Swiss-Prot record:
SMART domains: eIF1a. A motif (Nuclear localization signal) lies at residues 6-12, 56-65. It comes from Mus musculus (Mouse). It holds the Pfam family eIF-1a. It comes from the Eukaryota. The keyword Glycosyltransferase does not apply. This is Probable RNA-binding protein EIF1AD. Residues 155-170 have a biased composition (Acidic residues). The keyword Hydrolase does not apply. Residues 5-89 form the S1-like domain. Keywords: Nucleus, Phosphoprotein, RNA-binding. The modification Phosphoserine is found at residues 131, 135-137, 155, 159. Interacts with GAPDH and STAT1. The modification Phosphothreonine is found at residue 33.
Amino acid sequence: MSQASKRKHVVQEVLGEHMVPSDHQQIVKVLRTPGNNLHEVETAQGQRFLVSMPSKYRKNIWIKRGDFLIVDPIEEGEKVKAEISFVLCKNHVRSLQKEGHWPEAFSEVAEKQNNMNRESQPELPAEPQLSGEGSSSEDDSDLFVNTNHRQYHESEEESEEDEEEEEEAA
Protein backbone atom coordinates (compact mmCIF):
# COMPACT_ATOMS: atom_id res chain seq x y z
CA MET A 1 0.00 0.00 0.00
CA SER A 2 1.40 3.39 -0.93
CA GLN A 3 1.97 6.08 1.67
CA ALA A 4 -0.81 8.27 0.25
CA SER A 5 -3.45 5.54 0.35
CA LYS A 6 -2.32 4.49 3.83
CA ARG A 7 -2.70 8.07 5.04
CA LYS A 8 -6.13 8.31 3.43
CA HIS A 9 -7.38 5.17 5.17
CA VAL A 10 -5.98 6.17 8.57
CA VAL A 11 -7.54 9.64 8.36
CA GLN A 12 -10.90 8.19 7.28
CA GLU A 13 -10.76 5.73 10.18
CA VAL A 14 -10.09 8.47 12.72
CA LEU A 15 -12.60 10.99 11.37
CA GLY A 16 -15.41 8.67 10.40
CA GLU A 17 -15.54 5.84 12.90
CA HIS A 18 -17.44 6.20 16.17
CA MET A 19 -15.53 4.57 19.00
CA VAL A 20 -16.78 3.63 22.46
CA PRO A 21 -14.09 2.59 24.97
CA SER A 22 -14.25 -1.02 26.12
CA ASP A 23 -13.86 -2.12 29.75
CA HIS A 24 -10.06 -2.22 29.68
CA GLN A 25 -9.66 0.98 27.63
CA GLN A 26 -9.78 4.46 29.10
CA ILE A 27 -10.15 8.05 27.95
CA VAL A 28 -7.18 10.31 28.68
CA LYS A 29 -6.20 13.93 28.03
CA VAL A 30 -2.86 14.86 26.42
CA LEU A 31 -0.74 17.10 28.66
CA ARG A 32 2.46 17.37 26.63
CA THR A 33 4.52 15.67 23.96
CA PRO A 34 8.07 14.94 25.11
CA GLY A 35 8.97 13.53 21.69
CA ASN A 36 9.87 10.21 20.10
CA ASN A 37 6.15 9.45 19.48
CA LEU A 38 5.41 9.55 23.20
CA HIS A 39 2.71 11.65 24.84
CA GLU A 40 2.23 12.43 28.51
CA VAL A 41 -1.43 12.00 29.43
CA GLU A 42 -3.68 12.29 32.45
CA THR A 43 -6.61 10.05 33.31
CA ALA A 44 -9.90 11.24 34.77
CA GLN A 45 -8.62 10.13 38.18
CA GLY A 46 -5.53 12.37 37.85
CA GLN A 47 -2.96 9.64 37.17
CA ARG A 48 -0.18 10.74 34.78
CA PHE A 49 1.86 8.46 32.52
CA LEU A 50 3.31 8.14 29.02
CA VAL A 51 1.54 6.58 26.05
CA SER A 52 3.09 5.49 22.77
CA MET A 53 1.75 6.23 19.32
CA PRO A 54 1.40 3.18 17.07
CA SER A 55 3.22 3.27 13.75
CA LYS A 56 0.00 3.53 11.72
CA TYR A 57 -0.68 6.99 13.20
CA ARG A 58 2.88 8.32 12.93
CA LYS A 59 3.25 11.13 10.38
CA ASN A 60 -0.46 10.74 9.53
CA ILE A 61 -2.32 12.01 12.59
CA TRP A 62 -1.07 14.92 14.70
CA ILE A 63 -1.86 15.09 18.39
CA LYS A 64 -1.56 18.31 20.34
CA ARG A 65 -1.84 19.33 23.98
CA GLY A 66 -5.44 19.20 25.21
CA ASP A 67 -6.60 16.47 22.80
CA PHE A 68 -8.42 13.41 24.12
CA LEU A 69 -7.44 9.82 23.34
CA ILE A 70 -8.64 6.29 23.95
CA VAL A 71 -5.74 4.14 25.11
CA ASP A 72 -5.09 0.42 25.66
CA PRO A 73 -3.05 -0.41 28.78
CA ILE A 74 0.34 -2.14 28.48
CA GLU A 75 1.10 -4.40 31.44
CA GLU A 76 4.86 -4.68 30.98
CA GLY A 77 5.52 -0.93 30.75
CA GLU A 78 7.13 1.02 33.58
CA LYS A 79 7.07 4.53 32.16
CA VAL A 80 5.04 3.88 29.02
CA LYS A 81 1.86 2.35 30.40
CA ALA A 82 -0.49 2.47 27.39
CA GLU A 83 -0.74 2.65 23.62
CA ILE A 84 -3.01 4.99 21.68
CA SER A 85 -5.88 3.10 20.10
CA PHE A 86 -8.03 6.02 18.96
CA VAL A 87 -7.77 9.82 18.67
CA LEU A 88 -10.99 11.59 19.65
CA CYS A 89 -12.08 14.67 17.70
CA LYS A 90 -14.75 17.17 18.81
CA ASN A 91 -17.60 15.18 17.24
CA HIS A 92 -16.52 12.02 19.05
CA VAL A 93 -16.35 13.90 22.37
CA ARG A 94 -19.87 15.27 21.90
CA SER A 95 -21.32 11.87 21.04
CA LEU A 96 -19.59 10.21 24.01
CA GLN A 97 -20.98 12.93 26.29
CA LYS A 98 -24.51 12.36 24.96
CA GLU A 99 -24.22 8.59 25.43
CA GLY A 100 -22.90 8.96 28.98
CA HIS A 101 -19.50 7.34 28.36
CA TRP A 102 -17.59 10.57 29.01
CA PRO A 103 -15.77 10.91 32.39
CA GLU A 104 -17.14 13.65 34.66
CA ALA A 105 -13.65 15.05 35.34
CA PHE A 106 -13.17 15.77 31.65
CA SER A 107 -16.62 17.23 31.03
CA GLU A 108 -15.59 20.48 32.75
CA VAL A 109 -12.38 20.62 30.71
CA ALA A 110 -14.22 20.09 27.42
CA GLU A 111 -16.73 22.83 28.28
CA LYS A 112 -13.94 25.28 29.15
CA GLN A 113 -12.19 24.57 25.84
CA ASN A 114 -15.40 25.15 23.88
CA ASN A 115 -16.01 28.42 25.71
CA MET A 116 -12.42 29.56 25.16
CA ASN A 117 -12.71 28.78 21.44
CA ARG A 118 -15.86 30.87 21.23
CA GLU A 119 -14.26 33.76 23.13
CA SER A 120 -11.03 33.68 21.13
CA GLN A 121 -12.84 34.10 17.82
CA PRO A 122 -12.70 37.81 16.96
CA GLU A 123 -15.97 39.54 16.36
CA LEU A 124 -16.26 41.42 13.11
CA PRO A 125 -17.33 45.07 13.33
CA ALA A 126 -20.86 45.80 12.18
CA GLU A 127 -19.76 48.49 9.73
CA PRO A 128 -16.35 48.51 8.11
CA GLN A 129 -14.44 51.75 8.60
CA LEU A 130 -13.06 53.58 5.64
CA SER A 131 -9.33 54.16 5.65
CA GLY A 132 -9.72 57.89 6.36
CA GLU A 133 -12.23 57.57 9.19
CA GLY A 134 -11.16 57.28 12.80
CA SER A 135 -7.47 56.73 12.18
CA SER A 136 -4.68 59.21 11.78
CA SER A 137 -1.91 58.83 9.26
CA GLU A 138 0.61 59.61 12.03
CA ASP A 139 -0.29 56.50 14.04
CA ASP A 140 2.17 53.76 13.07
CA SER A 141 1.49 51.46 16.02
CA ASP A 142 -0.25 48.87 13.83
CA LEU A 143 2.69 48.54 11.42
CA PHE A 144 4.91 45.47 11.42
CA VAL A 145 8.22 45.96 13.20
CA ASN A 146 11.12 43.81 12.08
CA THR A 147 12.99 42.78 15.21
CA ASN A 148 15.90 41.27 13.26
CA HIS A 149 17.42 44.68 12.49
CA ARG A 150 19.24 46.99 14.84
CA GLN A 151 17.34 50.01 16.00
CA TYR A 152 19.33 53.20 15.46
CA HIS A 153 18.14 56.08 17.58
CA GLU A 154 19.63 59.46 16.87
CA SER A 155 19.05 62.07 19.52
CA GLU A 156 18.32 65.69 18.62
CA GLU A 157 21.41 66.93 20.48
CA GLU A 158 23.76 64.81 18.38
CA SER A 159 22.15 65.89 15.13
CA GLU A 160 22.41 69.61 16.10
CA GLU A 161 26.09 69.18 17.01
CA ASP A 162 26.77 67.43 13.70
CA GLU A 163 25.11 70.27 11.77
CA GLU A 164 27.16 72.90 13.66
CA GLU A 165 30.40 71.02 12.96
CA GLU A 166 29.55 70.79 9.25
CA GLU A 167 28.83 74.56 9.11
CA GLU A 168 32.13 75.40 10.84
CA ALA A 169 34.09 73.13 8.51
CA ALA A 170 32.63 74.78 5.39
